[in-house]
C-alpha cells in the first residue's frame, strides 16, 4: 500500500502529496485495538502456530498506514490511510519535532534522517 494522492488546505496552507517528498511510511497502529497488535495475529489451530502464513503485513489490515511527507517549503505532514470500513484518509500538518518523532516510529524509511530533516543538527549521545 502506498500513499494516495491528496490535496488539502489546512489553515491557509495547501498540502499536496503529489508535490511533496515522501520521507517514511508504514503501519500506524489503531489505538482501538489495544497496545499489543501482534497478539491479534497470534493464529493457532490445534496448537499449530499459523502466524507465519498471515505474516507481518497481515496486521496492516487492522489499523492505519501512515506516510510522512515534507513540502517544497520545508513543512511536514502525515497522511493516514484507514483500513477500517467507513473511515476516510486524513492529512495532518506536523511540527518538525512531531515529524522527527513519527519518522523514528515508521519502519520504511525512504530518505536518511539527514536528508529528511536538512539543517537539523545531530549531536553525539
What are these regions (language model features)?
Residues 1-125:
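Secondary-structure transition motif
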